[in-house]
A protein has these predicted regions:
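N-terminal nucleic-acid-engaging modules of covalent nucleotidyltransferase systems
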Residues: 2-211
Length: 211
């Protein structure tokens, strides 16, 4: 086959084009935080889950899902200005034993140290077997009235403080941290939760006039 001059010109000047395959568009799917917790969760687990929610509506949803009286008790203690703690503010003095060594200092500092250790180790195991807690806020909340004004004013202050320390020592460190925070109305410094959120989640709570 003889190619003409025109054919040759076309062949030498026409650029070969290739079609590149289109890459499929990628979509980022936001991973939603599960609202499911173990049966009878510790209250620090509930409050931690509340903190992880980015919207007010989701925080309220978590509070409604895990609604129970002990949770309301600590939230009222913390957020109701008419609830006045009659325990000394700030650090809680403590003297105890660790193996054969005597430990002297403050309960708050001791618990904070344990909490930091748990975070650094990534170990939040629970239960009596691991020494992280022998009781819960759920069980002990019935005694909290003794620590507020008008609850049990006839109780000797030394006895009251001793009871408070005993409860703290029996709790999981993260639950003890909650109780100490509520005593001084500082729960909001640990967990992202406000009185407004609590009030919307639990409209049955009557605020004020409790002392």
């Amino acid at each position: 086959m003889i190619l003409s001059h025109l054919d040759l010109k076309i062949m030498t000047t026409t650029k070969k084009t290739t079609t590149k395959p289109r890459k499929p568009k990628s979509f980022t799917v936001k991973k939603q935080v599960s609202l499911d917790l173990p049966r009878n969760p510790f209250l620090f687990e509930v409050l931690d889950l509340v903190s992880k929610q980015r919207t007010k509506a989701k925080k309220i949803e978590v509070l409604k899902k895990y609604e129970e009286l002990p949770l309301k008790v600590i939230l009222i203690w913390n957020f109701d200005e008419s609830v006045v703690s009659i325990l000394p503010p700030g650090e809680v003095p403590y003297t105890g034993y660790n193996d054969q060594n005597v430990y002297k200092g403050g309960v708050s500092a001791k618990i904070s140290e344990e909490v930091r250790s748990m975070h650094s180790q990534g170990n939040f195991s629970l239960g009596v077997s691991d020494g992280q807690g022998h009781t819960t806020i759920r069980r002990e909340s019935k005694h909290f009235y003794r620590f507020i004004k008008g609850g049990d004013d006839g109780l000797n202050n030394l006895r009251r403080e001793s009871m408070f320390i005993n409860i703290l020592e029996g709790l999981h460190p993260l639950e003890a941290e909650i109780v100490i925070a509520c005593k001084d109305k500082k729960l909001g410094e640990i967990y992202k939760i406000t009185k407004e959120i609590v009030a919307e989640a639990y409209p049955d709570i009557q605020w004020g006039d409790r002392s």
